[in-house]
Structures are given as C-alpha cells and as structure tokens.
Amino acid sequence: LLIEQENCLGGMWTSGLLSPLFDAHNKTGIMKELVDDLTAKNAWGGFWQISYIQEYMKHFLEEKALSAGVTLLYETKYAGVQVKDGTVEGVFVRNVEGETYYKGTIIIDATGDAHLASDAGAQWVMGDENGNCQSMTLMFLVGGIPEKYKDGFVMYQVLEEAYAKGIRHFTLEVR
C-alpha cells in the first residue's frame, strides 16, 4: 500500500514541477530505466538535457508501482501513527472517506518532512550542522517559446554569458 497526499506519484518531481534530474545519465537501475522510457516518449531533455515532462513522469511512476502490485491510495494525508513498545504498528490517514487506520509490518516515512518518524519518536535533524536548509526553488512552466530556444542551447549560452559577466538581472529580448 502506498499512501499519497497528492493525486499522482512523484512528490516534488511531479506536483512541484521539480524536473531537473542532475547526473541522471551516470545512473543505472530504475533511474536509467526512467530516463530511457522518457527519452523513448520524447519527454526527456529540456533546458540542460536533464529535464522531463512531468505528465510522462507521473505515468511512468504509476505504471511501475501498479506493475509491481502496489495498491495506490491517492489524495490521502498522513494523520497519525500507532506505536507500541517502541515499534510502529500502523498509521492513521485521512481523506474524503474519513479517517482510516492501516496496520503494517514495514512502514516507510516518505512524507518529505519526517512527520511520521517524528511522531513515532525517532530522532531527526534538520539542515546542515548549523541548521541551515537548502533554499527554496521556484519552478515554472513557460509556453510560447520561439523555436530557436526550444532545445535550450541558445538560452543556456545567454545565461552562461550573463553569469560570466557577473550579471544577475538581465532582460532577454526575443525577436
């Protein structure tokens, strides 16, 4: 059973539009399979040749989970954990049907912010040794891009030149 708070798998990869997969070409296993599948569907590449189309990623992840026999429970939020004698026995979840309890032998916290682990009493740390966390990333989709910029190479060169000059704010005039 996989409990997902969104209406698709992938978390920030899909719902958060966080599409760059840095160093993906040097990976094997499921990551290579993922890149190969997205490439075959013309859904891989983008700005730095490390991005993908989120809708295809959603499909890939769901297909993999279902083919492995995973039951998916979408739009369901973690609501609490049942711990007995230091062992997590199950989780409470909440969705439009109300609150439900699921007992399990192996429970993995994939909340992204360790809610389940924290509620179960696990020790955790946040940030680096000084408590600093990675800054937020703003991701967005842009349409109507002129053809010459679609492969990303020309735009990449413009950005590289701007950074080399130390320019952080610039305007790109599209003609």
Residue positions per predicted region:
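Conserved N-terminal/central alpha/beta ligand/cofactor-binding core
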Residues: E4-K84, Q134-S135
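Short, hydrophobic/aromatic-rich segments at coil-to-beta transitions
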Residues: D85-V91
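Rossmann-like dinucleotide-binding core of oxidoreductases
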Residues: L116-R175
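Core beta-strand elements of the Rossmann-like FAD/NAD(P) dinucleotide-binding domain
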Residues: N95-I106, A110
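Glycine-rich phosphate-binding loop of nucleotide-binding enzymes
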Residues: E89, A110-T111, H115
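Conserved beta-strand positions in the Rossmann-like core of class I SAM-dependent methyltransferases
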Residues: L1
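Short, solvent-exposed loop/turn segments at the edges of secondary structure
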Residues: G86, T111, C133-T137
